[in-house]
Amino acid sequence: MSAESASQIPKGQVDLLDFIDWSGVECLNQSSSHSLPNALKQGYREDEGLNLESDADEQLLIYIPFNQVIKLHSFAIKGPEEEGPKTVKFFSNKEHMCFSNVNDFPPSDTAELTEENLKGKPVVLKYVKFQNVRSLTIFIEANQSGSEVTKVQKIALYGSTVETTDMKGLKKIEDH
């Protein structure tokens, strides 16, 4: 981790990248040649030549499950000045969302990204709304200029894990 990226992580929080369940990650309306791993996966998201791009219009709907319960504190999204995300809505523990029903649910939080945010400045979320997060849905509703394509260079999620017991690791005690 570079000194620059370490300084971006809010004090007392960690990058939640290692806690993402990659087998369940989905992104609706992504370009097939500019997909979500470009903005989310380690190594890819640090390469400014790679990005996630929307396909049919400016909206993106991203579903991120975690392999353990987390507390989400803040996020950082990097993107270009014109096509970078502007209105971003976050939904905690809402599965099976799609563009036809995303407006049926109130978001856990909404952020309006500024030019400074698009350079990687973290945005603090309503922490009380993200205490027991098993999955996160991110709805990028609009971009900075209203253009047809939204581009995201990096998505980073910051928070902490919740101490829980791994129920899969427990063994049944047999009666004798």
Curated annotation (Swiss-Prot):
Residues 5-176 form the PITH domain. Belongs to the PITHD1 family. The keyword Acetylation applies. This is PITH domain-containing protein At3g04780. GO terms for cellular component: cytosol. Keywords: Acetylation. It comes from the Eukaryota. The modification N-acetylserine is found at S2.
